[in-house]
């Protein structure tokens, strides 16, 4: 079930869950300035299943911002599912499963992605985010060509 009316600051939710809800909300709103404020200055954003020539990780809030700042020019996200949260023995780490629906602006093709994210929170900020997504879905949505997909992200640096 998809829901784009995420509830933020629910007192029954952990800090990590609240931050994830804000993360998704700001993505839907295309507010990358608020989105990046959720990240620690020394955060790490990892993509363990990214395609070849895609960075395995991006280190530092400013580099993460350079990676994400043009995202709203490439894709319109319509909604995210309510994340299924798995708590870990470390209360600062959670695992979230969720889906999104959107459309790639340049191709007009739908974007329907499934995510599993491992998120670590330190001092109320995202300190480490492992983003497990299917690059084949993204490549197909960008027209089926890996080069076109990679060219859509000129801010990527390995």
Model-assigned labels for residue ranges:
Residues 82-86, 114-119:
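Hydrophobic/aromatic beta-strand elements that line small-molecule binding cavities or substrate pockets
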Residues 39-40, 100-102, 117, 133:
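Short beta-strand segments enriched in hydrophobic/aromatic residues
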Residues 91-100:
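A short hydrophobic beta-strand element
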Residues 1-38, 148-158:
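Short, low-complexity N-terminal intrinsically disordered segments enriched in polar/charged residues
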Residues 40-89:
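A solvent-exposed, acidic/Ser-Thr-rich amphipathic alpha-helical stretch
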Residues 116-140:
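Short beta-strand edge/turn micro-motifs at domain boundaries
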Residues 102-112:
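Short, cysteine-centered beta-strand-loop-beta hairpins and adjacent loop/turn segments enriched
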């Amino acid at each position: 079930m998809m829901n784009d009316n995420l509830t933020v600051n629910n007192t029954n939710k952990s800090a990590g869950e609240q931050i994830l809800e804000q993360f998704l909300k700001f993505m839907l709103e295309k507010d990358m300035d608020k989105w990046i404020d959720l990240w620690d200055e020394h955060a790490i954003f990892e993509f363990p299943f990214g395609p070849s020539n895609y960075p395995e990780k991006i280190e530092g809030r400013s580099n993460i911002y350079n990676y994400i700042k043009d995202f709203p020019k490439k894709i319109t996200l319509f909604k995210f599912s309510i994340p299924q949260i798995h708590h870990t023995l470390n209360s600062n780490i959670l695992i979230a499963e969720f889906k999104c629906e959107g459309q790639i602006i340049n191709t007009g093709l739908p974007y329907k992605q499934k995510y599993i994210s491992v998120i670590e929170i330190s001092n109320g900020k995202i300190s480490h985010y492992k983003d497990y997504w299917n690059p084949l879905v993204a490549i197909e949505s960008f027209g089926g060509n890996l080069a076109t997909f990679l060219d859509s992200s000129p801010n990527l640096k390995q």
